[in-house]
Amino acid sequence: MDPSASITIDDSLWPLLQVRFPSAFTNSQQEQYLSRLLTYLRRGERYVGILDTHLLKNTTSEQRQRQADFIKEHEALFRSCSLGTAGIITSPLMALGARILIHLKPMPSPYYVASSLPAAVTWAAERLELAGLFGPAERVRRHFGLLAERRTG
Protein backbone atom coordinates (compact mmCIF):
# COMPACT_ATOMS: atom_id res chain seq x y z
CA MET A 1 0.00 0.00 0.00
CA ASP A 2 1.23 3.47 -0.88
CA PRO A 3 1.55 5.26 2.49
CA SER A 4 1.07 8.63 0.78
CA ALA A 5 -2.36 7.60 -0.47
CA SER A 6 -5.03 8.96 1.79
CA ILE A 7 -8.74 9.49 2.05
CA THR A 8 -9.47 12.96 0.70
CA ILE A 9 -12.40 15.13 1.70
CA ASP A 10 -13.52 18.01 -0.52
CA ASP A 11 -16.12 20.47 0.78
CA SER A 12 -15.52 23.14 -1.88
CA LEU A 13 -19.07 22.60 -3.23
CA TRP A 14 -20.74 22.52 0.21
CA PRO A 15 -23.43 21.33 0.93
CA LEU A 16 -21.94 18.61 -1.29
CA LEU A 17 -19.26 16.68 0.58
CA GLN A 18 -17.04 14.56 -1.66
CA VAL A 19 -14.88 11.80 -0.20
CA ARG A 20 -12.37 9.90 -2.33
CA PHE A 21 -10.87 6.66 -1.14
CA PRO A 22 -7.50 5.32 -2.33
CA SER A 23 -7.02 1.66 -3.29
CA ALA A 24 -6.28 0.92 0.39
CA PHE A 25 -6.02 2.90 3.60
CA THR A 26 -4.75 2.41 7.12
CA ASN A 27 -6.82 2.33 10.31
CA SER A 28 -5.20 5.63 11.26
CA GLN A 29 -6.31 7.22 7.97
CA GLN A 30 -9.82 5.91 8.58
CA GLU A 31 -9.87 7.48 12.05
CA GLN A 32 -8.75 10.82 10.58
CA TYR A 33 -11.56 10.61 8.01
CA LEU A 34 -14.18 9.71 10.63
CA SER A 35 -13.00 12.55 12.86
CA ARG A 36 -13.40 15.06 10.02
CA LEU A 37 -16.78 13.62 9.09
CA LEU A 38 -17.93 14.05 12.67
CA THR A 39 -16.87 17.70 12.52
CA TYR A 40 -19.18 18.20 9.52
CA LEU A 41 -22.04 16.35 11.23
CA ARG A 42 -21.70 18.47 14.36
CA ARG A 43 -22.20 21.64 12.31
CA GLY A 44 -25.85 20.68 12.16
CA GLU A 45 -26.09 21.72 8.50
CA ARG A 46 -27.87 19.64 5.88
CA TYR A 47 -25.56 18.15 3.27
CA VAL A 48 -25.33 15.37 0.71
CA GLY A 49 -22.31 13.12 0.29
CA ILE A 50 -20.55 11.36 -2.55
CA LEU A 51 -18.22 8.53 -1.56
CA ASP A 52 -15.94 7.72 -4.49
CA THR A 53 -14.69 4.19 -3.90
CA HIS A 54 -13.88 3.29 -7.50
CA LEU A 55 -10.17 2.83 -6.66
CA LEU A 56 -10.79 0.96 -3.42
CA LYS A 57 -9.81 -2.70 -3.66
CA ASN A 58 -10.98 -3.93 -0.28
CA THR A 59 -11.30 -3.02 3.37
CA THR A 60 -10.46 -5.09 6.39
CA SER A 61 -13.16 -6.55 8.61
CA GLU A 62 -11.89 -4.24 11.37
CA GLN A 63 -12.37 -1.20 9.10
CA ARG A 64 -15.86 -2.30 8.07
CA GLN A 65 -16.80 -2.83 11.72
CA ARG A 66 -15.40 0.57 12.70
CA GLN A 67 -17.45 2.23 9.95
CA ALA A 68 -20.61 0.43 11.10
CA ASP A 69 -19.94 1.38 14.74
CA PHE A 70 -19.39 5.02 13.76
CA ILE A 71 -22.67 5.16 11.85
CA LYS A 72 -24.55 3.54 14.72
CA GLU A 73 -22.93 5.82 17.31
CA HIS A 74 -23.83 8.97 15.35
CA GLU A 75 -27.10 7.79 13.82
CA ALA A 76 -29.09 10.76 15.15
CA LEU A 77 -26.66 13.23 13.56
CA PHE A 78 -26.83 11.39 10.23
CA ARG A 79 -30.63 11.41 10.36
CA SER A 80 -30.81 15.14 11.06
CA CYS A 81 -28.05 16.37 8.73
CA SER A 82 -27.46 13.93 5.89
CA LEU A 83 -29.75 14.31 2.89
CA GLY A 84 -28.21 11.11 1.57
CA THR A 85 -25.04 9.54 0.27
CA ALA A 86 -24.18 8.27 -3.19
CA GLY A 87 -21.49 5.62 -3.19
CA ILE A 88 -19.58 5.19 -6.45
CA ILE A 89 -18.96 1.47 -6.73
CA THR A 90 -17.76 0.28 -10.14
CA SER A 91 -17.35 -3.41 -9.36
CA PRO A 92 -20.65 -5.25 -10.00
CA LEU A 93 -19.86 -7.73 -7.24
CA MET A 94 -19.07 -4.99 -4.69
CA ALA A 95 -22.19 -3.07 -5.76
CA LEU A 96 -24.34 -6.14 -5.21
CA GLY A 97 -22.74 -6.67 -1.80
CA ALA A 98 -23.40 -3.04 -0.86
CA ARG A 99 -27.05 -3.28 -1.91
CA ILE A 100 -27.52 -6.47 0.11
CA LEU A 101 -25.92 -4.90 3.20
CA ILE A 102 -28.05 -1.77 2.88
CA HIS A 103 -31.15 -3.94 2.53
CA LEU A 104 -30.25 -5.96 5.63
CA LYS A 105 -29.13 -2.95 7.71
CA PRO A 106 -30.61 0.25 6.29
CA MET A 107 -28.56 3.42 6.54
CA PRO A 108 -29.86 6.29 8.72
CA SER A 109 -30.27 8.41 5.58
CA PRO A 110 -30.92 7.62 1.90
CA TYR A 111 -28.11 5.76 0.12
CA TYR A 112 -27.63 5.28 -3.61
CA VAL A 113 -25.17 2.91 -5.26
CA ALA A 114 -23.90 4.72 -8.37
CA SER A 115 -21.79 3.24 -11.14
CA SER A 116 -20.18 6.56 -12.12
CA LEU A 117 -19.46 10.09 -10.91
CA PRO A 118 -22.10 11.67 -13.21
CA ALA A 119 -24.75 9.28 -11.85
CA ALA A 120 -23.72 10.09 -8.26
CA VAL A 121 -23.72 13.85 -8.92
CA THR A 122 -27.14 13.69 -10.60
CA TRP A 123 -28.59 11.84 -7.61
CA ALA A 124 -26.90 14.18 -5.11
CA ALA A 125 -28.22 17.28 -6.92
CA GLU A 126 -31.73 15.79 -6.88
CA ARG A 127 -31.42 15.24 -3.11
CA LEU A 128 -30.41 18.89 -2.67
CA GLU A 129 -33.42 20.02 -4.72
CA LEU A 130 -35.79 17.82 -2.69
CA ALA A 131 -34.53 19.68 0.39
CA GLY A 132 -35.22 23.04 -1.27
CA LEU A 133 -31.54 23.77 -1.90
CA PHE A 134 -31.99 24.76 -5.56
CA GLY A 135 -29.00 27.12 -5.77
CA PRO A 136 -26.49 24.56 -4.48
CA ALA A 137 -28.01 21.88 -6.73
CA GLU A 138 -27.52 24.07 -9.80
CA ARG A 139 -23.98 24.99 -8.72
CA VAL A 140 -23.10 21.29 -8.34
CA ARG A 141 -24.54 20.41 -11.75
CA ARG A 142 -22.74 23.34 -13.38
CA HIS A 143 -19.42 22.37 -11.78
CA PHE A 144 -19.67 18.85 -13.19
CA GLY A 145 -20.99 19.96 -16.59
CA LEU A 146 -24.41 18.40 -16.09
CA LEU A 147 -26.56 21.44 -16.90
CA ALA A 148 -28.32 21.43 -20.25
CA GLU A 149 -27.20 24.30 -22.44
CA ARG A 150 -29.87 26.94 -22.93
CA ARG A 151 -30.68 27.73 -26.53
CA THR A 152 -31.16 31.29 -27.67
CA GLY A 153 -32.69 32.62 -30.82
What are these regions (language model features)?
Residues D2-G153:
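Amphipathic, Lys/Arg-enriched alpha-helical "gate/interface" segment within cytosolic domains
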